[in-house]
Amino acid sequence: MAEQMGQVASLFGDWPEAIIWTCLEGRMGQIHVDNTQSPQSALALYGRQSFFGFLAGKPNADLLKMCEGKDIILVPQNQAWSDLIEGTYGDRIRSFTRYATKKDTSFDLGHLQKLIDALPEEFDLKVIDRNLYDACLVEEWSRDLVGNYADVEQFLDLGLGYVILHKEQVVSGASSYASYLGGIEIEVDTRG
């Protein structure tokens, strides 16, 4: 099994995506392949309501079909995958560039503390606990702050997040969107 997962991981190469790492570790999400004995194509599928699908290796129409009917962002590894997606879905898709933030960085804790200290009195910064986990699930805009975790227990075990409250209502948050051994993918949302 470890050898096969190594083969699958090699299909993704050094693609710097936390969501892929999360799926490969088996913590969250799923990995699908064209052939379990000798995989040539792989799909890292992540999400619970809306999804990301990272497509790697040789383009494979069957893996692409697994994504049908989902609210999904497909992320092709190369032009060959892009061509298959465009050939399969034509004008039913919208292509766009997805930008990532810098992954290997450090926080200026002093600057963060100044921002917290400058928060107006009527706002409170709180760590996401059981009650705030549930509060984040109530409204669509805040669901991604916790919604990719199977339940509150998984979030408290693997995740991390903070929200800003105004009059006891969640108005903004920063939280783990995905968790892997080396870190988290961060989701930031603010009520519109």
Give the role of each language-model region.
Residues 136-139, 187-188:
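A short secondary-structure junction signal
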Residues 15-26, 139-161:
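Active-site rim helix/loop that mediates acceptor-substrate recognition in acyltransferases
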Residues 150-191:
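A conserved beta-strand-loop-helix scaffold within acyl/acetyltransferase catalytic domains
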Residues 24, 91-93, 117-119, 154-156, ...:
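A generic structural signal for short, solvent-exposed coil/turn residues
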Residues 20-36, 54-56, 152-154, 166-167:
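Short, solvent-exposed secondary-structure boundary motifs
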